[in-house]
Amino acid sequence: MDPAASSCMRSLQPPAPVWGCLRNPHSEGNGASGLPHYPPTPFSFHQKADFPATATAAYPDFSASCLAATPHSLPQEERIFTEQHPAFPQSPNWHFPVSEARRRPNSGPAGGSKETRTSSLGLVDTTGGPGEDCGVLGSTANETEKKSSRRRKESSDNQENRGKPEGSSKARKERTAFTKEQLRELEAEFAHHNYLTRLRRYEIAVNLDLSERQVKVWFQNRRMKWKRVKGGQPISPNGQDPEDGDSAASPSSE
């Protein structure tokens, strides 16, 4: 028997290259992941009669042993375990579904929050638009009311200012409408006497159905007119109208 074959039979573990081939292809990651690796399958030697004939016949068929270590060659229970717990850590894509799943729910609320933000913004815009319009309309209405009130005040002030001269002119225009008979009697009396006594003024007022004031005012106006036309008489030495003195002296004056 070949010494190399006997040493291989005596040792439970094959040489380093043989042991690396028999191990799981993903066994390098077992050290990092901490998962146990499956024991290698026993060697299968080809028993030949002419063993020393060829040197290669003494070595086992490593291809079969390496294929036996694959998950497809393992028993069903071990295959399920390897499928559930792979020995070699997967690529970063293995974490992608989890991160994607985490991102998806996060993106859902984020998207929802964005949608809610946009919807809230939309609601604010839709509700704020008419609110602003109402505020603008209210301000314009207040401005129009203020302007109208100012215009009313100005118009009322103008009317009052206009009404005052009109009232004064009306008061001035309110003159006694003497009849022809009254004017005839007054002219005849003025031709005889430019100044009237208190008693004579009272008699004329009673006869013509006038007041003493009306008679007095008429005679004053008539004297002013006569002075403008004729030059009139000189003023009395006392510098006072005789009617005024008479009326002031009489107790029955106005």
Swiss-Prot record:
What is the name attached to this protein's record? Homeobox protein MOX-1
Q: Which Pfam families match?
A: Homeodomain
- Swiss-Prot/TrEMBL keywords: Activator, Cytoplasm, Developmental protein, DNA-binding, Homeobox, Nucleus, Repressor, Transcription, Transcription regulation
Q: Which InterPro entries match?
A: HD (IPR001356), HD_metazoa (IPR020479), Homeobox_CS (IPR017970), Homeodomain-like_sf (IPR009057), MOX-1/MOX-2 (IPR042634)
Query: In which domain of life is the source organism classified?
Result: Eukaryota
Gene name of the encoded protein: MEOX1
Q: Which residues form a coiled coil?
A: none
* A GO molecular function held by the record: RNA polymerase II cis-regulatory region sequence-specific DNA binding
GO cellular component assignments: cytoplasm; nucleus
List the biased-composition ranges (Basic and acidic residues): 154-178
Q: What does this protein do?
A: Mesodermal transcription factor that plays a key role in somitogenesis and is specifically required for sclerotome development. Required for maintenance of the sclerotome polarity and formation of the cranio-cervical joints. Binds specifically to the promoter of target genes and regulates their expression. Activates expression of NKX3-2 in the sclerotome. Activates expression of CDKN1A and CDKN2A in endothelial cells, acting as a regulator of vascular cell proliferation. While it activates CDKN1A in a DNA-dependent manner, it activates CDKN2A in a DNA-independent manner.
Q: Write the lineage as a comma-separated list.
A: Eukaryota, Metazoa, Chordata, Craniata, Vertebrata
BP GO terms, sorted:
hematopoietic stem cell differentiation; positive regulation of transcription by RNA polymerase II; sclerotome development; somite development
What ranges does the record give for the region Disordered, renumbered to this chain? 87-178, 227-254
DNA-binding region residue numbers: 171-230
Keyword Hydrolase in the entry? The reply is no
The subcellular location is:
Nucleus; Cytoplasm
**Which CDD domains does UniProt cross-reference here?**
homeodomain
Primary location: nucleus
